[in-house]
């Protein structure tokens, strides 16, 4: 059984700290922020291990100690560990770290608040001593970055100083999109141990900052990854491991990484898992539109130009299945990510009882790829009069299993205000969530409709020449953003919105098109090309997929990083695997 004691995250109340109005820099001790000159003088106490043997467990071989400092989605690693047959002991005191037989540190969120928590609670010193003694350790994502001297994120900010180097932001001038989101390949070195089964398979990354190989840290490196440049994707020295990617979100190959850490004496397989990964893959995302039907049941539905009701006398909500079951099937079918869109208000529920929260908790038990949830990420007051901020709503979604949250109407309001004033207030849900959890955790969903015009000067928005003329032969159009499920048009174009939300902290754009929704005639290539050419963050093409050819078309003709579909997968018209096989035949990199 899992230990019943409260996790460290609840003791330090870091979630409440993150919700405060003070900025990260203000909430962090001044000692965390270093000058570039002093960064190189960080004291490093790590000693080379005398033995590579695994320390025998003094309690139980089926218990893992987990350091959860209270930010982001840690439920997924918990579920992965349970899936592998392990129970979890949560860190409550520094002594729990020192007494751990094996320790996993799934760092999520931003560097500065994580170091703030570790320093305030004495965990930083305990972590360094644990690692110095060559005890079994696995850091994940931020759990790798914190081992370095410092980070430029919100800083410079001093790290644990175990590994030489500065964690810096990816260089977008190299022609890459930042954040680095998606499935990429590893270049595995010798003696990686926990990566022995990976081979040429993709693993899942989501980060904006990285550490670079150097002469000073080369002895730590067990694998690198290429994204505009070579960066450190994993380290290993003795029993100390850390990875930049998310094994708990990398499907079966990721579970094999965790399994090898937990069972270091497992015999090597005859050959690594088969695959042909060589670079960042294009993603195929399955979307589930979730709402209550007229009977009060939570169902997956699908719209026709955003209309989700059957065209019959009953006019009932289309019911295409139960969300948890469908998500599980999509995972088995090979979906690279699963996106839930909550299209019901649910405002009568207390936050912890929201139906979508329950869907996430159940889904994340057996689905080990990224989960995104959208709809309703805004301030609200429930039926009892309790007020919740958008940051609290997002925090609950993350703690329930979401890896990314998608903001729609609220982002439109924030963008309109930003364009009008030219000032970032820091008060919008987009800015607040991005500041606490990093922009890689925030997706902005854009719902535009095509508006034809006779001449580019007819409107004060970005106008393009379209491939298909309008009903009166118009050769030009702009894309008007909408809110309230497409029912209300706003005085802002998709181009203007995309540029604004990137400035405000969005890490990814989900680009829909009302005109193409449910039509099965392909994505709006003109729109996708316009937006993906205009921003430096990843763009997900959505609306209109009807055949595998539509996926290859959008990847070949635009700079979209991913393509999303709903209805064709729900109705089993096109299997996910068929889409991937087609993309592979077209020589488009995909995860198989």
UniProtKB/Swiss-Prot annotation:
A cellular component term, taken from the record's GO annotations: plastid
Record-annotated Glutamine amidotransferase type-1 domain positions: 63-271
Any coiled-coil regions, as ranges: none
Signal sequence annotation: none
Annotated TM spans: none
Keyword Transcription regulation: no
Role played: IGPS catalyzes the conversion of PRFAR and glutamine to IGP, AICAR and glutamate. The glutaminase domain produces the ammonia necessary for the cyclase domain to produce IGP and AICAR from PRFAR. The ammonia is channeled to the active site of the cyclase domain.
Identification of the protein by name: Imidazole glycerol phosphate synthase hisHF, chloroplastic
Species the sequence originates in: Arabidopsis thaliana (Mouse-ear cress)
């Amino acid at each position: 059984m899992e230990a019943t004691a409260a996790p460290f995250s609840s003791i330090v109340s870091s979630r409440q700290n993150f919700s405060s109005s003070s900025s990260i820099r203000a909430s962090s001790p001044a000692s965390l922020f270093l000058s570039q000159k002093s960064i190189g003088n960080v004291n490093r106490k790590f000693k080379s291990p005398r033995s590579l043997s695994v320390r025998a467990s003094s309690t139980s071989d089926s218990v893992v100690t987990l350091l959860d400092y209270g930010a982001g989605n840690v439920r997924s690693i918990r579920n992965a560990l349970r899936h592998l047959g392990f129970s979890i002991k949560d860190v409550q005191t520094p002594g729990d770290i020192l007494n751990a037989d094996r320790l996993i540190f799934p760092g999520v969120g931003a560097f500065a608040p994580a170091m703030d928590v570790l320093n305030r609670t004495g965990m930083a010193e305990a972590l360094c001593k644990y690692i110095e003694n060559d005890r079994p350790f696995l850091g994940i994502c931020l759990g790798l970055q914190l081992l370095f001297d410092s980070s430029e994120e919100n800083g410079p900010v001093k790290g644990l100083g175990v590994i030489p180097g500065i964690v810096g932001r990816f260089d977008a001038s190299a022609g890459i999109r930042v954040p680095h989101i998606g499935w990429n390949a590893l270049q595995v070195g010798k003696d990686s141990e926990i990566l022995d089964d990976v081979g040429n398979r993709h693993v899942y990354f989501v980060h904006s900052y990285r550490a670079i190989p150097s002469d000073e840290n080369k002895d730590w490196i067990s694998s690198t990854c290429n994204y505009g440049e070579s960066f450190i994707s994993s380290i290993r020295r003795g029993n100390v491991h850390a990875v930049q990617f998310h094994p708990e979100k990398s499907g079966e190959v990721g579970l094999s990484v965790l399994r090898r850490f937990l069972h270091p004496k497992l015999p090597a397989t005859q050959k690594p898992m088969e695959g042909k990964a060589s670079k960042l893959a294009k993603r195929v995302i399955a979307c589930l539109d979730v709402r209550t039907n007229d009977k009060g049941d939570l169902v997956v539905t699908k719209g026709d130009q955003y209309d989700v009701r059957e065209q019959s006398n009953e006019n009932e909500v289309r019911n295409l299945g139960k969300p948890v079951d469908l998500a599980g099937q999509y995972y088995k079918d090979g979906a690279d990510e699963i996106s839930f869109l909550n299209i019901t208000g649910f405002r009568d529920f207390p936050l912890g009882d929201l139906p979508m929260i329950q869907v996430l908790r159940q889904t994340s038990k057996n689905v080990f790829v990224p989960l995104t949830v959208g709809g309703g990420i805004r301030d609200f007051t429930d039926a009892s009069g309790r007020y919740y901020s958008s940051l609290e709503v997002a925090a609950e979604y993350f703690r329930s299993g979401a890896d990314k949250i998608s903001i729609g109407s609220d982002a439109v309001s924030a963008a309109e205000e930003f364009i009008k004033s030219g000032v970032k207030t820091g008060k919008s849900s987009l800015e607040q969530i991005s500041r606490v959890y990093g922009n890689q955790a925030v997706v902005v969903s854009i719902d535009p409709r095509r508006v034809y015009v006779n001449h580019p000067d007819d409107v004060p928005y970005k106008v393009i020449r379209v491939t298909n003329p309008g009903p009166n032969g118009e050769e030009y159009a702009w894309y008007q953003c909408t809110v309230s499920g497409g029912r209300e048009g706003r005085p802002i174009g998709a181009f203007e919105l995309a540029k604004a939300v990137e400035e405000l902290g969005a890490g990814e754009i989900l680009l829909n098109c009302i005109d193409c929704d449910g039509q099965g005639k392909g994505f709006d290539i003109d729109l996708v090309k316009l937006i993906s050419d205009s921003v430096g963050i990843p763009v997900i093409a959505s609306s209109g997929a009807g055949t595998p050819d539509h996926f290859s078309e959008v990847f070949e003709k635009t700079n979209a990083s991913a393509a999303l579909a709903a209805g064709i997968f729900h109705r089993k018209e096109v299997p996910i695997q068929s889409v991937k096989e087609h993309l592979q035949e077209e020589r488009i990199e995909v995860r198989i």
